[in-house]
A protein has these predicted regions:
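C-terminal motif of bacterial Sec signal peptides marking the signal peptidase cleavage site
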Residues: 12-15
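Positively charged n-region of N-terminal signal peptides that target proteins for export
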Residues: 1-4
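Feature captures C-terminal
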Residues: 18-35, 84-86, 90-92, 98-103, ...
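Hard-cation-handling environments
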Residues: 31-33, 37-113
Length: 253
């Protein structure tokens, strides 16, 4: 008897239970444009609260680290800014005792332009906001050709001086040369790039076949730090930074 009442209760609960299905009756949406017009109506209390943080950020981002002749922008298949960043990868390699044959920097990792004139550390962070670190990999010539095919399929990435690719408008590789020479399939090529790409991301899966992979130890190996150091060195030498579009990647048909 003592088990009967709980059992009856369970039966009644099951009998009363109904399964409901839910369907979307309507959808409403609107687009909210977030731009600087909100800055005109920031409450005074919020301004006062944020002021000390803003001063701290400004103290870090406002120092001038470099100088450019004009605005450097990103564009495919080749651009001044992507050329510069790929060249900086090669330059940095020599600072770490490496002798890279070429450098690669992805267009997707370039998030802003470098302004004309004075360049601040904040400008560099805008260009390279991620914690990507410089790395060095060895690829065979055959794997390097695969890498160039993948770059062509993506419409172009940043490649260093000496690389000459001819591609079609629909992303096929026609020819590839390095320092005026054809790529030797059995040769070994040292590539400087960020660790994100060296892991085979952004469709550059040829990097998965890399050997002798190295990320330098210690602080200051992030891309933005290396870019900053290059800009500082050029500024100290009195050289405003520029980088021409010189046919590193050409669409020929």
């Amino acid at each position: 008897m003592k088990h009967l009442i709980p059992l009856l209760s369970l039966v009644l609960l099951c009998a009363c239970h109904t399964t409901r299905t839910w369907q979307v009756a309507s959808v409403e949406r609107t687009r909210l444009v977030v731009d600087n017009h909100y800055e005109a109506s920031i409450p005074e209390e919020a301004k006062q609260y944020l002021a000390p943080y803003a001063r701290q950020v400004d103290s870090i981002s406002s120092p001038i680290v470099g100088l450019t002749k004009h605005t450097l922008r990103r564009a495919q298949p080749e651009s001044e800014l992507s050329n510069l960043l790929a060249d900086i990868m090669v330059w940095a390699g020599k600072q770490y005792g490496e002798q890279p044959d070429l450098g690669i920097y992805n267009m997707g990792g370039i998030r802003a332009s470098l302004p004309a004139g004075d360049v601040t550390y904040g400008n560099v962070v805008d260009v390279a906001p991620f914690d990507n670190r410089i790395s060095f990999s060895t690829l065979t010539g055959a794997d390097l050709m695969d890498l160039f095919r993948q770059i062509a399929a993506r419409g172009g990435e940043g490649v260093s001086h000496g690389v000459a690719l001819e591609i079609t408008a629909n992303g096929e590789l026609i020819s590839a040369r390095l320092n005026g020479k054809e790529i030797a399939p059995e040769a070994q090529y040292r590539v400087a790039t960020i660790d994100y790409l060296a892991a085979g991301n952004d469709g550059l899966i040829a990097f998965k076949k890399k050997t002798n992979f190295r990320i330098p130890e210690g602080a200051g190996t992030e891309a933005r730090y290396i870019i900053t150091e290059y800009l500082r060195a050029e500024r100290a030498a009195g050289r405003p930074v520029e980088r021409p579009v010189e046919g590193r990647i050409r669409i020929v048909r």
